[in-house]
Amino acid sequence: MTCTVLVGGGWGDEGKGKCITYLCYNDKPSIIARAGVGPNAGHSVEFRGDKYGLRLTPSGFFHEDARLLIGAGVLVDPEVFLHEMEYLSKYSVADRTGVDYRCAIIERKHKEQDQSSSYLSKKIGSTGTGCGPANAERVMRTAKLAREVEELGDFLTDVPLEVNEALDEGEDVFVEGSQGFGLSLYYGTYPYVTSKDTTASTAAADVGIGPTRVDEVIAVFKSYITRVGEGPFPTEISQEEAEEMGLEEYGTVTGRRRRIGLFDMEMARESCMINGATQIAVTCVDRLYPECERVREYSDLSAEVKRFIEDIESATGVPVTIISTGPSLEDTIDLRDELL
């Protein structure tokens, strides 16, 4: 039995989708549970030549023997959720997905409030998906819950019960966090943050898992840092510099251009400390070091990349166990058997 929690170490967009895809395909957990804020975060998943953009469904959906769950701490937009059930019908996702009956619901009024607020949309850089206003209503104890939405009736379940029974029976459980450490309401670059905490402890709580049941915490970092929207960014470089390096990205949900910066060792250290990381995954190594594109053995990485990996381990005190060198599952160096 292993309970693994995966979280973003930066400001989101770290490549969590690729890591989740790889880990769930190889480790085949019985349950894949989605934690995090809600549909304001997008995970990009590429599997067998097809690309998917997800906002609520767990990114490990392609593992067709897994039960897919959305924890009580996650805000659910019924329109987004039901669209994804249809969108992913090829994988029989609707037959395998459960939504905790205590999830708070994002209503149209929440999206309108989010989008009409100049403070949220312009100063803070909100995605406009209604998460902040919906979470505010939950705090005020006025939010509608999933059990009150007829269209969700067939999907309702008790997520903590399912997850803990699976752990009791010796099954593997994988918890997907969303966004990243730098966007945490408590530990991020306040006020330029999301509407709740994004660390591993909260991700576990989102799905009803107590801290003593978590075995592994994987913090995901991109080999360079990106950020969508406003807020401090100590290692940011200009768009011109980013373009010269071949780094140009756009957000999955908003379509906004991502700001680019160099890897931030201090942020990585703090992120690993507060998340209690036991492992680190480093993604997009091929983007920063093209000579390492699709390399699949650690010994074949360039000396420069090896030094970079060693510097991360030295700064954080956490082993780098997963290195992504390309978009496909095969473009992954997995060092877990050697280091753990």
From Swiss-Prot:
MF annotations from Gene Ontology: adenylosuccinate synthase activity; GTP binding; magnesium ion binding
Alphabetical list of Gene3D superfamilies matching this protein: Adenylosuccinate Synthetase, subunit A, domain 1, Adenylosuccinate Synthetase, subunit A, domain 2, Adenylosuccinate Synthetase, subunit A, domain 3
Entry annotation: catalytic residues: D13 (proton acceptor), H43 (proton donor)
GO cellular component terms given for this protein: cytoplasm
Reactions performed catalytically: IMP + L-aspartate + GTP = N(6)-(1,2-dicarboxyethyl)-AMP + GDP + phosphate + 2 H(+)
Keyword NAD applies: no
Cofactor remark: Binds 1 Mg(2+) ion per subunit.
Pfam short name (any one): Adenylsucc_synt
Keywords, ordered alphabetically: Cytoplasm, GTP-binding, Ligase, Magnesium, Metal-binding, Nucleotide-binding, Purine biosynthesis
Record has Metal-binding as a keyword: yes
Residues that coordinate or bind Mg(2+): D13, G42
SMART domains assigned: Adenylsucc_synt (SM00788)
Function: Plays an important role in the de novo pathway of purine nucleotide biosynthesis. Catalyzes the first committed step in the biosynthesis of AMP from IMP.
Subunit structure of this chain's protein: Homodimer.
Name of the protein: Adenylosuccinate synthetase
The organism of origin for this protein: Methanothermobacter thermautotrophicus (strain ATCC 29096 / DSM 1053 / JCM 10044 / NBRC 100330 / Delta H) (Methanobacterium thermoautotrophicum)
Gene that encodes the chain: purA
